[in-house]
Amino acid sequence: MTVRCVLATIDLEGLGLDRGGHLLIQHALEGVPVGAEVLVRGNDPSLRVHLGAWARSQGHTVRDGAIVVRGSATSARWSGAERAGGYAPNGAVQHPGPTWGVAARGALVEAGGPTLRFDLEDKDLVWSDLAPRLYAQAAASQWDPNTAVEWDAPFDLPAEVEAAVVQVMTYLVENEQVALIVPARFLGRIHPHFREVLQVLAVQAADEARHMEVFARRAALRGGPLGVSGAGGRASLATLLNEPDFALASFLLSVLGEGTFLNLLGFLEVHAPDPISRSITALARQDEARHVAFGMAHLEHQAALDSALRARLRAAVERRHDALMETVGLNQQVFDALVLLAAGSWQPQAIARGYAAVEQLQHAMDDGRQRRLVRLGFPHDEAKALSALHTRNFM
């Protein structure tokens, strides 16, 4: 039943509907019920022609050329709308509506529209309560490779030591490229309702892009060619690219791979022979720590809800180990370069110290993996066994 109200009046003066006058009329109509009349005045010569056309397009009627009678079309349009959860992180729903698509979380979603499906649209498969805080930290910690690193810092290295640095940097670039591709692949598969997760993965990819830049830039700093890329290392990294499951990919890359890399970057921060290499590995290490933290938080959340997750994680480690059994693992040139960097010279005693330092690094990597596995609920003996199966290529 329509409601007949006393006329309201709006004066557009010289403003035409083709210049924004419709906004004032629409605003006036929103304040009256269906069936109410609004008198529209103005001195634009096309007002009456435009008013009739606009009113019909909006489901209203016009009488006497200047009185708009509010229709019900606008109200009816939103009668079946629903809220897409709430704006805040605790407003994320378990399963977003099939027609919500890319609507912002918390928006009022008009009924209808296309059904947009995402592979990962179950909150438990992607969520971490830590994601909003990690994203905020990451956004506040972004650094510019051109200004955060003193690229013209003076240093002079023997040719063999410079070659060792170049080899390690070449290896780091190779690994960082994969560390960028993996999260980037999942960005298009996760429902945007879980925007904090997308933000974390997006900034993670941006982090890796910077790491690729600074490591490649240091490798080429003295104008020589880059180092070698071993087939075994590339085979190890390919297994990360071939993993389609988000939880398993996060586990293999972030918890095991990048977690192991934290130790390597810390090692280089101490033993790198020049200030630029020490600086860029320190910067990268800060970023990688966030990546590991998100991977752990996500898997801890999922493990608390899915008792079968640990069996799947175990199977992923074993499957990857079996696939890489025939490969040589870490490139010998990379291992030797790490020894030389830790040694600092070609003296036998120095080389012995360098070799011991790399062995200690590998033990620290193993200890770190075991601690993270225990945090995910694996018994200590199983954590030790699974850590031992991790790729010899570190990542």
Residue ranges and their predicted role:
Residues 280-284, 291-320, 324:
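A beta-strand-loop signature enriched in Asp, Gly, Thr, and Trp
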Residues 24, 75-199, 220-221, 225, ...:
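Terminal targeting/low-complexity segments that flank the catalytic cores of oxidoreductases
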